[in-house]
Amino acid sequence: MAVEFHLVFAVPFSPFTSRVIKNTWLCHLSKLIKTVVIVGGGIAGWLTAGRLAAKHQSHKANGLNVVLIESSNIPAVGVGEGTWPTMRNTLKAIGISETDFIRECDASFKQGAKFAKWCTGKDDDFYYHPLVLPQGFGKVDLAAHWLAKQGRVSSFSDEVCYQEAICEQGLAPKTIRTPEFSDVANYAYHLDSAKFAAFLQKHCQEKLGITHLVDDVTEIHSVEGEYDSEKGDICSVVTQNNGEIEGDLFVDCTGFSSLLLGKHFG
């Protein structure tokens, strides 16, 4: 059975990586995909690799072959990173333990965003964007009722959901007995990006059978396009130490350098 892919696409880091991959199935070219080559590591590269490998059983003999090529000349930067609640589904789909993830990536729960001194600039002025949806969301506009309320003293988020109160009390969105990835209140994560990338790499190699090459891509080869001036789909990349790497689908996870989409296709 042929799986529909466009033969190269870029995946910037985003909590919606799994959605990007899912939508890529709908592209117009049809080809039987046996080997996927991902150029670029980091969170974007390893999330992409993990999602594909877990979905298509790369750890089995007849599964999808996933190869990730990562340059050693790009240092890992350990900065704080915020995610969206959909990250929980992504981690679960890859087969990651939430407990291990929290411990090894210095992760903490994210329940929303609080914008201090939002309107007046005073210390007690703020705007909350919680991750729990307002009561009756999609059925009734509570904002109009809140605006019409005379002498209001509470914020909009406090009027329409309970998450602001949880945050102000310094409470977690779940208890110690709540199952992994389940919640009492909706949540995402804050984490150390360098530790998260290393954690994903270890899991993907040990549990999902992904091939990891630490190397630099020096050349990119395409099949002939429909017109003489057009570059066709990428068929292989040449690396400095491992030679030519062929594939059926190439994913650009090189970030701002955009090695495949930007520099090659331009």
Residues covered by each model-derived region:
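Acidic, Ala/Val/Gly-enriched low-complexity intrinsically disordered segments
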Residues: A2-E4, V8-V11, V20
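N-terminal Rossmann-like FAD-binding beta1-loop-alpha1 element of flavoenzymes
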Residues: K34-N62
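Glycine-rich FAD pyrophosphate-binding loop
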Residues: A54-V79
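Dinucleotide-binding Rossmann-like beta1-alpha1 core, especially the glycine-rich loop
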Residues: P75-C167
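Helical element adjacent to the flavin cofactor pocket in flavoenzyme catalytic cores
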Residues: Y187-V217, N241
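A conserved short coil-to-beta-strand element within the FAD-binding core of flavoproteins
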Residues: L213-D233
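Core beta-strand elements of the Rossmann-like FAD/NAD(P) dinucleotide-binding domain
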Residues: Q240-L249
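Flavin (primarily FAD) binding-site architecture
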Residues: C253-G266
